[in-house]
């Protein structure tokens, strides 16, 4: 087969604050010929996750993205050429494909999916959504980090995002007595209760007193706070946690674009209410992804 090319987004410069059109650059690159055990994949979708933001500016648990390097992310694609006996042309696969239109990759670095699983409302993007990193983050955050028990009340920030929305639905399926989501618009809040199965929602932009709104919506307090935001919202949520409450720290949306992180300031309740807070990286549970996806 003749020479093939890919279009790829790379990091042009490190952003100060919110990334803009100067942060990224679109390049075209030739793809190499296949070697044994490799496949050529046409990428159909790639993810854009808030958790990718820190690596654009600084060192993280996955390292800092070097200037001029591909933006890394999960992706979905179709095998168009193969020298791997386990993968055929036309197979749907996922992997760490990054922001590019195609790539040559070792077959063992791809996960093959059955297209029959994705029908009706379950679109192929579920493979990198509810069954991908966002879904796994929700699952292990609730089950392994927060230790959700039957009948408990769960409060979730950024609840209309991929992680938050999945966490809310999973919490109900895992036996939570009440699940409350925090979002930033009436439309998002309406969706949480009408479509996503949340018991109540809070529009933090409209709340006259966010702490009172949290306390009222949770029915007097929460056992678990699933934190995707950090900042002032975290400090406020700490005040409404019940004795022995747990905080699972999944993300820090309020902190990612700050040059100097605000950090947590409300620490006394950790003593008086015997609270615990634990951060986690979902990749620590990667060997358990398969069984978790089957249960989901």
Write out the residue ranges for each language-model feature:
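Short amphipathic alpha-helix with an adjacent loop that forms part of the alpha/beta core around
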Residues: 208-219
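N-terminal Rossmann-like NAD(P) cofactor-binding module of classical short-chain dehydrogenase/reductase
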Residues: 94, 155, 202, 225-226
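Glycine-rich beta-strand-centered segment in the early N-terminal region that forms part
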Residues: 31-48, 56-99
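Mid-domain Rossmann-like dinucleotide-binding core that forms the NAD(H)/NADP(H) cofactor-binding site
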Residues: 128-207
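NAD(P)H dinucleotide-binding glycine-rich loop of Rossmann-like/cofactor-binding domains
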Residues: 73-78, 89-158
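Residues at the starts of beta-strands that form the adenosine-phosphate
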Residues: 7, 177-179, 246, 276
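Glycine-rich phosphate-binding loop and adjacent beta-alpha segment
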Residues: 193, 232-296
């Amino acid at each position: 087969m003749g020479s093939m090319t890919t279009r790829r987004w790379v990091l042009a410069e490190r952003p100060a604050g919110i990334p803009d059109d100067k942060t990224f650059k679109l390049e075209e690159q030739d793809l190499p010929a296949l070697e044994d055990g490799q496949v050529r994949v046409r990428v159909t979708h790639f993810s854009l996750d808030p958790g990718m933001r820190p690596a654009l500016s600084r060192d993280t648990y996955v390292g800092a993205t070097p200037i001029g390097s591909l933006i890394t992310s999960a992706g979905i694609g179709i095998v168009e050429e193969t020298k791997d006996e386990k993968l055929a042309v036309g197979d749907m696969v996922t992997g760490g494909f990054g922001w590019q239109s195609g790539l040559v990759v070792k077959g063992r670095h791809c996960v093959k999916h059955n297209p029959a699983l994705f029908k009706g409302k379950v679109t192929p993007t579920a493979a990198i959504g509810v069954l991908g990193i966002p879904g796994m983050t929700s699952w292990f955050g609730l089950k392994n980090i927060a230790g959700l028990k039957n009948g408990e009340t769960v409060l979730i920030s950024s609840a209309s995002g991929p992680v938050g929305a999945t966490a809310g639905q999973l919490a109900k399926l895992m036996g939570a007595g009440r699940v409350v989501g925090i979002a930033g618009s009436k439309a998002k809040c309406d969706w949480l209760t009408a479509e996503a199965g949340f018991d109540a929602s809070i529009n933090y932009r409209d709340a006259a007193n966010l702490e009172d709104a949290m306390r009222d919506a949770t029915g007097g307090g929460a056992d678990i706070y699933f934190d995707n935001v950090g900042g002032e919202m975290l400090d406020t949520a700490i005040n409404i946690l019940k004795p022995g409450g747990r905080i699972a720290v999944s993300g820090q949306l309020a902190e990612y674009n700050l040059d100097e992180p605000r950090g947590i300031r409300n620490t006394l309740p950790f003593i008086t209410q015997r609270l615990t807070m634990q951060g986690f990286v979902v990749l620590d549970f990667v060997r358990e992804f398969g069984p978790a996806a089957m249960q989901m």
